């Protein structure tokens, strides 16, 4: 798929398709990744869809390994792979994207993905292969104020689709300061939080947790902004927990702010983690585990 390129890419693709009849080249009739994806998928003649960006590189074994996995595991709807973060810009080698890749590469099993889906995107878009039937059943990529791939994953998962990730690096994912995910509003943190809120309510209902009192870890600026987005999607935070003595005892939108030491199974609450730097997350998990709280049953990371 050529999405309005102006650097000779289309001619290069035509040349390749002339040498290998398995390659078919199309130009997207409109501009933008969503239109290009849906247009290309609509012209595919296969059970499975795999894609990647023009600046990424996949290992020669990628398609075979993913095809074989889906063929051998018909209960699985989407299979991803681990990825290697690559950049020619030194200041991006230790950026948030590289930390995200490190996190994502540890999210492998169906259970891992279910618990991680609202923390960040659990699979890297150019690393996936999935059943084309998913799109016919649940709809294709959507254009809107949200990341089109993350919204699609949450939609699939909300319908019961099964995801798996191979414990194998099969893609080199190239990063640059000019990439869309760094510069377009639909990939902002606020857009991700909005997308999470759209699907979290149905997840809580599916897990039988909607009857519990929904509380939040964090009462700072980032957490309260996230809480407002949740409220707009019918998820009302009844109580906030924090460690800051200047916040404890106050209220946020009429909800009390309490000390994290008051967190207890006896409260019959479900806790949404709305704040916490990457380096702090293991400490939060350890704290909650010591209080006998179980991820997915008593708490869930949303940040």
Task: State where each predicted segment sits.
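Short, acidic/glycine-rich phosphate-metal binding loop used to engage nucleotide
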Residues: 4-6, 26-33, 37-38, 57
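Hydrophobic, well-ordered beta-alpha structural blocks that scaffold small-molecule cofactor pockets
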Residues: 118, 149, 153, 172-303
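A conserved acidic beta->alpha catalytic loop
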Residues: 2-11, 53
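The conserved acidic donor/metal-binding loop of glycosyltransferases
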Residues: 53-57, 82
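Short aromatic/hydrophobic "clamp" motif used to bind/position activated sugar donors
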Residues: 49
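Short alpha-helix within the catalytic core of nucleotide-sugar-dependent glycosyltransferases
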Residues: 10-14, 46, 59-71
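Flexible acidic/His/Gly-enriched loops in nucleotide-sugar-dependent glycosyltransferase catalytic domains
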Residues: 20-22, 33-41, 65-69, 73-134
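Conserved nucleotide-sugar donor-binding catalytic segment
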Residues: 42, 100, 104-184
């Amino acid at each position: 798929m050529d999405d309005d390129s102006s650097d000779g890419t289309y001619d290069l693709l035509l040349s390749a398709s002339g040498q290998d009849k398995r390659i078919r080249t199309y130009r997207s009739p409109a501009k933008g990744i969503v239109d290009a994806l849906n247009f290309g998928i609509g012209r595919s003649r296969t059970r499975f869809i795999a894609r990647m960006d023009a600046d990424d590189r996949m290992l020669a074994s990628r398609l075979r390994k993913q095809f074989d996995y889906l063929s051998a595991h018909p209960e699985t709807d989407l299979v991803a792979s681990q990825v290697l973060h690559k950049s020619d810009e030194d200041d991006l080698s230790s950026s948030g994207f590289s930390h995200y890749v490190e996190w994502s590469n540890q999210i492998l099993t169906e259970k891992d993905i279910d618990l991680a889906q609202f923390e960040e995107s659990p699979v890297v878009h150019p690393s996936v292969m999935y059943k084309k039937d998913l799109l016919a059943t649940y709809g294709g990529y959507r254009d809107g104020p949200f990341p089109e791939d993350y919204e699609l994953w949450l939609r699939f998962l909300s319908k019961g689709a099964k995801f798996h990730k191979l414990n194998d690096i099969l893609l080199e994912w190239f990063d640059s300061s000019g990439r869309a995910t760094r510069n377009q509003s639909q990939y902002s943190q606020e857009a991700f939080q909005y997308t999470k809120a759209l699907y979290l309510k149905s997840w809580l209902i599916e897990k039988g947790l909607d009857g519990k009192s929904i509380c939040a870890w964090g009462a700072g600026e980032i957490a309260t902004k996230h809480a407002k987005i949740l409220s707009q999607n019918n998820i009302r935070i009844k109580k906030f927990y924090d460690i800051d003595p200047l916040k404890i005892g106050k209220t946020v939108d009429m909800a009390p702010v309490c000390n994290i030491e008051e967190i207890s199974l006896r409260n019959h609450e479900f806790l949404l983690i709305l704040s916490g730097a990457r380096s702090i997350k293991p400490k939060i998990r350890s704290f909650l585990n010591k209080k006998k709280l179980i991820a997915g049953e008593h708490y869930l990371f949303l940040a």
